[in-house]
Swiss-Prot record:
The lineage of its organism: Bacteria, Bacillati, Bacillota, Clostridia, Eubacteriales. GO terms for cellular component: cytoplasm; membrane. It is found in: Cytoplasm. It comes from Clostridium perfringens (strain SM101 / Type A). Residues 1-228 are annotated as: Pyrophosphorylase. Acetyl-CoA binds at residues 384-385, 421, 438. This is Bifunctional protein GlmU. Residues 250-454 are annotated as: N-acetyltransferase. Signal peptide: none annotated.
Length: 454
C-alpha cells in the first residue's frame, strides 16, 4: 500500500520567544523537524510533505537535504487548515497518510511504522496515536466503544465520566487518504477561535460510519515543544535515550548526565567516556578508547585505542593508538596517523601527520604533510601564511625538528634530516642533512660591568 506523510511545521511558536521558527530549534544537534522527517524515512515512508508558514524559506533551507516537498500555510488557521493546505500533495494519491507535528522530536520510527501497520491491518479510516497519563488535565480525552474510538472530547467539555479518562490524544494520526480528503471538505471554522481543527475530522468520519481506531504509545514520545523549558526537557530525555543505547552496546559512560552525545554518533565497545565530553555530528569512535574529561569531537573519525584529554577535534581523522592532548586543537581536514603523539598546546590545521610521529608540546602545524617517525621540539611553528595565501610544507620521514624552529612555507624538509634548535628554515633541506639557520653566538666579556647593570 502507498504511504506518505505530512509534517505540520508552519507555526512561529510565540512562547519559545525566538526569531527562529520553532521547529528549527535543535534537540541534540538536529532541528526538531528533521528528527521527525528522519523518523518517517526510517519507518519506510519516503514521500514526505512539510507544511511551512512562518519562516518558510528558512525551514526549506534547513530541510532541503531531506528531499521533501512543501505546502505553504500562509495564515495559521488551525491544524485542519494546515492539512487542507496539503490538498495538492494528497490529490491523486491512494493509500494512507501519516500526520505528525514538527515539534515532537522524540517520536520513534518504530512507533510511526506500528501506527501505520495498525491502521492498515485494522482497516481503519483513521487511527489516532494516544497515550495514557496520570494527570490528563488540559488534554483531549479519547472516548472509546470497545476497541473503536467514538470521539475526542476536549478537557473543558468533559462530563463527570469523561474527565476521569486517562487516555489522551497525542495529535498524531494515520488516515485513509480518500476519507481524509472527503472529510476536509466538510470541516468548519464555526468556533470561538475561527480555526479549522483536525480533530473535527474524527467526528465527521464517525457520522459517516467510518471506522476509527487508536494505538497507545509512551507519552514521552509524543511530547511537543512550546517553550525553552519544554525544549530542555525533551533534549534531556533524548540525551538519556542516546546514552542508554551506547551503554547497552558496551560503552562505559561514567557520568551520563554530564556527557553530551548526538544521535548519529557511533562508538565502539569498551570505550570509556569521562564526564564533560561533547561528541557531535557523524563522529565515529573505535573500540577501547579513553576520552578523559572535557573534550569536544565533531564529525571526526577516531580509531581504536585512542586516548584524548581535554582537547578539540573537528572534521578530522585520528589513527589507532594515538594520544591527543591535553589542550590540543585538531582543526578540520587533518589526518593524524597511528601511534602518534599530539601533546599539550599543539594545533594541527589541514595537515597529514604520519605514523609514529611525536608533536609533544607548544607547536603549530598548518597546511603540511609530515612523514612517519618524525619528532617536533617544543615551540616549532609551520609559518604557512604570507598575509595573502596559505602555502604548503612537506616534511619527510625520520626528521628531527629542534625546539623553536620556524618552517617558512612553501618549503620541503627531506627524509632523515635534523634541524637545529632556533632555526628559521626558508630553503629545502636535503636528505640526511643537518640544517642550522641562526645567528652565530657572540659573548661580550665585561659588558655587564661596563653598563653597570649590577
Amino acid at each position: 500500500m502507498n504511504k506518505c506523510a505530512i509534517i505540520l511545521a508552519a507555526g512561529q511558536g510565540t512562547r519559545i520567544k525566538s526569531k527562529l521558527p520553532k521547529v528549527l530549534h535543535k534537540a541534540c544537534g538536529k532541528e526538531m523537524v528533521n528528527h521527525v522527517i528522519d523518523a518517517m524515512r526510517n519507518a519506510e515512508i519516503d514521500d514526505v510533505n512539510v507544511i511551512i508558514g512562518k519562516g518558510a524559506e528558512l525551514v526549506k533551507e534547513r530541510t532541503t537535504s531531506k528531499n521533501v516537498s512543501y505546502s505553504l500555510q500562509a495564515e495559521q488557521l488551525g491544524t485542519g487548515h494546515a492539512v487542507k493546505c496539503a490538498k495538492d500533495f494528497l490529490e491523486g494519491k491512494t493509500g494512507v497518510v501519516a500526520i505528525f507535528t514538527g515539534d515532537a522530536p522524540l517520536i520513534k520510527a518504530e512507533t510511526v511504522k506500528n501506527l501505520v501497520d495498525t491502521h492498515i491491518n485494522e482497516k481503519n479510516s483513521a487511527t489516532l496515536l494516544t497515550s495514557v497519563i496520570e494527570n490528563p488535565t488540559g488534554y483531549g480525552r479519547i472516548v472509546r466503544n470497545g476497541e473503536s474510538v467514538e470521539k475526542i472530547v476536549e478537557h473543558k467539555d468533559c462530563n463527570e465520566q469523561e474527565i476521569k479518562i486517562q487516555e489522551v490524544n497525542a495529535g498524531m494520526y494515520c488516515f485513509d487518504i480518500e476519507s481524509l480528503l472527503t472529510s476536509l471538505e466538510q470541516l468548519s471554522n464555526d468556533n470561538a477561535q475561527g480555526e479549522y481543527y483536525l480533530t473535527d475530522v474524527i467526528e465527521i468520519l464517525k457520522k459517516d460510519n467510518k471506522k476509527v481506531g487508536a494505538m497507545i504509545t509512551d507519552f514521552e514520545e509524543t511530547l511537543g515543544v512550546n517553550s525553552r523549558a519544554e525544549l530542555a526537557k525533551v533534549e534531556s530525555i533524548m540525551r538519556n535515550r542516546i546514552n542508554r543505547t551506547h551503554l547497552d552496546n558496551g560503552v562505559t559512560i561514567i557520568d551520563p548526565l554530564n556527557t553530551y552525545i548526538e544521535p548519529e554518533v557511533v562508538i565502539g565497545k569498551d570505550t570509556i567516556i569521562y564526564p564533560g565530553n561533547v561528541i557531535e555530528g557523524k563522529t565515529v569512535i573505535g573500540e577501547d578508547c579513553i576520552l578523559y574529561p572535557n573534550s569536544r569531537i565533531n564529525n571526526s573519525t577516531i580509531g581504536n585505542g585512542v586516548e584524548i584529554q581535554s582537547s578539540v577535534i573537528l572534521d578530522s581523522k585520528i589513527g589507532d593508538e594515538t594520544t591527543v592532548g591535553p589542550f590540543a586543537y585538531v582543526r578540520p581536514e587533518s589526518n593524524i596517523g597511528e601511534h602518534v603523539r599530539i601533546g599539550d598546546f599543539v594545533e594541527i590545521k589541514k595537515s597529514t601527520i604520519g605514523n609514529n610521529t611525536k608533536v609533544s608540546h607548544l607547536t603549530y602545524i598548518g597546511d603540511a604533510e609530515v612523514g612517519e617517525r618524525c619528532n617536533f621540539g617544543c615551540g616549532t611553528v609551520v609559518v604557512n601564511y604570507d598575509g595573502k595565501k596559505k602555502h604548503k610544507t612537506i616534511i619527510g620521514d625520520d626528521s628531527f625538528i629542534g625546539c623553536n624552529t620556524n618552517l617558512v612555507s612553501p618549503v620541503e624538509v627531506k627524509d632523515n634530516t635534523y634541524i637545529a634548535a632556533g632555526s628559521t628554515i626558508t630553503k629545502e633541506v636535503p636528505e640526511g642533512s643537518l640544517a642550522i639557520a641562526r645567528a652565530k653566538q657572540q659573548n661580550i666579556e665585561g659588558w655587564v660591568e661596563r653598563k653597570k647593570l649590577k
